[in-house]
Amino acid sequence: MTNIRKTHPLLKIVNTSFVDLPAPSSLSSWWNFGSLLTICLAVQIATGLFLAMHYTADIETAFSSVSHICRDVNYGWLLRYLHANGASMFFICLYLHVGRGLYYGSYMFLETWNVGVALLFAVMATAFLGYVLPWGQMSFWGATVITNLLSAIPYVGTDMVQWVWGGYAVDKATLTRFFAFHFILPFIIAALVMVHFLFLHETGSNNPTGIPSDLDLIPFHPYYTIKDILGFVFMLTALLTLVFFSPDLLGDPDNYSPANPLSTPLHIKPEWYFLFAYTILRSIPNKLGGVLALVLSILILVALPMLHTSKQRSMTFRPISQFLFWLLVADLLTLTWIGGQPVEHPYMLIGQTASILYFSLILIFMPLAGIAENHLMKW
């Protein structure tokens, strides 16, 4: 008798995706982050749903409702901090996932990669909207500064800002619509994840060597299910350690003060996971130029397949490209550090230098390294 998982219409889909899926035998731990991101999304949707039951999207009561969740709701503090720190874990896994794709040439799966970039934009938008909801000082001023960037768009900019705000300033209408979008976007992200999976399963996974692995495939279960469970344990341990021992480590103290339009914080900054892009934005004195650089700092990922010049897919056997890759990682960490510093000397100069290096590495040095390595290999 044939196993039910291979004949049942629904179980058959699960079986071909997670049980009998042929996977390369050489996948390292860097391939764990896709499954970790799925867990992160599930945690965020679950905690967010329960938080939404107690939160009120009104400027008069939003701050108080978050306080009420932490003080009066059973395990409300746990829900709130799981959600807030879960977002940080989400971005850690997301950036490592993208970095893995860059290092091992996974961007050569065009459809999967482009859907992934769309997912990155959607997750960043969701996180920004969520940061506004507690209606603290940094929520209010972050929303004001970031949405105001739309005014840099020629001709229609000012109208777009007022359209997003729902008035002439960040106010009640802004908070209401931000909550509505923050609620619906994770479900759109979940749908995009399905499309991401669909395209990935059309081609099969890449592997650390970058060489087609059709001759050496193993079933996903039990090998990679066990491996993924180990990843879940490590990630959830890190998340729970953060939540129970230092829940405010990655937050901003200013957000514990209710929003006050008459008092500007000394240093307006987004959450840590946006600081690298924020530095690039600040590095250009021109407003429109800064906004374009901000968007291009993420959109540049779409261009990676076109910038691939090496005859090898992965960087595993390409030492020059490896050096440039780790230089890019160091540059991104520098950008993140500078984003948290005030706009003054020497931070501005370091930020501008790091921003130029970021684009130069991706657009100029990495493609040149690929060509050089081809010549060195006499290809």
From Swiss-Prot:
SUPFAM superfamilies: a domain/subunit of cytochrome bc1 complex (Ubiquinol-cytochrome c reductase), Transmembrane di-heme cytochromes. Binds 2 heme b groups non-covalently. One of its GO terms (biological process) is mitochondrial electron transport, ubiquinol to cytochrome c. Heme b b562 binds at H83, H182. GO terms for cellular component: mitochondrial inner membrane; respiratory chain complex III. Heme b b566 binds at H97, H196. It is a multi-pass membrane protein. This is Cytochrome b. The chain crosses the membrane at residues 33-53, 77-98, 113-133, 178-198, 226-246, 288-308, 320-340, 347-367. GO terms for molecular function: metal ion binding; ubiquinol-cytochrome-c reductase activity. Belongs to the cytochrome b family. Keywords: Electron transport, Heme, Iron, Membrane, Metal-binding, Mitochondrion, Mitochondrion inner membrane, Respiratory chain, Transmembrane, Transmembrane helix, Transport, Ubiquinone. Its cofactor is heme b. The cytochrome bc1 complex contains 11 subunits: 3 respiratory subunits (MT-CYB, CYC1 and UQCRFS1), 2 core proteins (UQCRC1 and UQCRC2) and 6 low-molecular weight proteins (UQCRH/QCR6, UQCRB/QCR7, UQCRQ/QCR8, UQCR10/QCR9, UQCR11/QCR10 and a cleavage product of UQCRFS1). This cytochrome bc1 complex then forms a dimer. It is found in: Mitochondrion inner membrane.
